[in-house]
Amino acid sequence: MEFRRILVPVVGTEADDEAIRLACRLAKKDKGKIWAVSVITLSRTLPIEAELENEIKKAEAVLEHVETVAEEEDYEVETDLFQSREAGPTIIDEAVEREVDLILMGVTYKTRFGQFSLGTVIPHVLKNAPCRVILYHQIKAD
């Protein structure tokens, strides 16, 4: 399998770090390109062009950290920040626009009502992705 164009959505978890490391290893093999994207989701009560300074600063810090992790792997990552109502459709739109071969996502151990949960973004991406998807699952901390 060749992965020349890899999209890595990030939110700032340890699983993101490992997903970026894995993306770098996969991309190196084929001299591929990696895009790390962060999506700020806006409440429907706010206008889509609303500027949430704190959220933007957090997302920019996450993207800067991702660049550092990639540098540790001796690879370069291009980063982008988006604002939208829902992260899932934005990730899919970017995957289509960039014609990626792979979406690689870090998954943390989350529970909802006492059960393990993937949330809403990951199922949306799995259902609608125009390419392969790899989930990197972070081990549950005890």
Model feature map: region roles:
Residues 1, 71-103, 142:
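Structural beta-alpha unit
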